[in-house]
Amino acid sequence: MKVLKSIYKVMGCAILAASLSSCVNDWLDVAPSDGTDAGAALTSSSDLDAARTGMYKALKGNSSLVDYYGQQFFVYGDVHAGDDYQYNYIGGSNRANFYYDMNYQTASEFNTSTVSWQSPYVVIGRANRIIAAAEGGKLSDAVEAKAKIEQYAAESKVLRALAHFDLVRIYGKPYTEDQGASLGVPLVIGVLESNAKPARSTVAEVYTQVVKDLTEAISSNALATETKPGYVSVWGAKAILSRVYLNMGDYANALSVAEDIIKNSGAALWTRDQYFKAWDASTPNESEFLFRLNVAGSDDNNDLNGIGNLQQRDGYKEMVATKKFVDMLTSDPKDVRNDMFLPATASKEVEKYGTNKVFLNKLRGQGGDLRNVTIVPIIRLSEVYLTAAECAFRNNDKTKAVEYLNDLVKNRTTTEAFLATVDNITLERILIERRKELIGEGQRYFDALRNNETITRYTSEADKGWHKTLSKEAQSFNRDYFKAIAAIPQAEINANPNIKQNTGYGE
């Protein structure tokens, strides 16, 4: 597959030729299933509309390209940690074991089946194409379609920011480790010349651009104020911005944005009675979703390789909750999130996991069809409450931290002992609640890195929980271990000598 060459063809130019395989390059080099020629000029708002569809499709992926929110980003964000959600080595089929086993040594092992690289840059390329056309002033209906054009440009800036943000968290050190001084990823914020070979920007430079894109989109007042499934609104943009500030350790700004969402978005936490049914793909409860993808139908589903089928007991069943996580969650039998898991049924898995509920049942698919996972969460209101609680605590406002944490907990359990007080609230307590709430949504690993946690799968062969035997380095590690961040795919290094590889990886 052509990695950045294909990406920049989507932008209207070809650079950084690289070849990994030939499985999906046709999808990138021709019209992106959006009714537009990838190299044709955008001359009207209707052209932008079609290009916008292609941009969102790249975020979701398809059955051949699942290296972003179609599958791989969620696997990376949860299974690379492996302390709450592990590879199911009993019944899995090696689709989610790469970052769990951590046996990789060379950059050539990183490609679209193992890491998010190509698709985020496709999103960026398509976003740049829309922004350039929208802001170029040459669209045939620039006056009469002004509001629509500005909205599409603002959405494109949000998705460009999201893709850069996700990339820099995978390939760069956490911002909180060195205030962004180390290398991040190439910033692509416009159409590049055909001979361009961009170097990696620093983590700080990438974050600066991410914040700039998000704040410009928000302040443009062009984003929709009503949240609609499949598209980003002003509240989705603000939620992403709050997450970005949190990852930067900018707790004051993260709290400010989170509180704006809580007070003014009109979104509401699911109640305990609503929680399980809210994830029903046929009749989803939208009140918590600030930004989710709408994957439905043969045009944009990820077929059996999608994240829903990977998680589900009746699908590829690649991942299971760890014993440590199950013990943590079941310590409160009245917590409704216990209902989000199913027990094993296959004999070998029953032998290993017993009657414990280990298979996550969030992404259930529409009508039982696990290829049509219509609910793919990018960010929910519950995360915003947890961000507000964490940031208030870090800013020494325990009263406010208790308020936001308990607002969530009261909607998940009736056990009063799990409610926090000013006297007993701790950062650990807030982070544990975050783990319970967001499992399977791709955030655990990044939270561990930004907080400089030691990720511990197990430390004793005599007490491994449900883990298989792992290398010593994979049993317990922190962000100092070179494998804590991914290698830049070797094909990119070969094509562009300006891209420096992450330390520790051979070819």
Language-model region placement:
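Membrane-proximal, proline-rich intrinsically disordered regions
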Residues: 3, 22-78, 277-279, 311-316, ...
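Extended ligand-binding clefts on enzyme/binding-domain cores
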Residues: 45, 50-52, 60-63, 205, ...
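Sec-dependent bacterial lipoprotein signal peptides
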Residues: 1-21
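Short, surface-exposed recognition loops and adjoining beta-strand edges that mediate ligand/DNA contacts
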Residues: 34-42, 66-88, 172-181, 185, ...
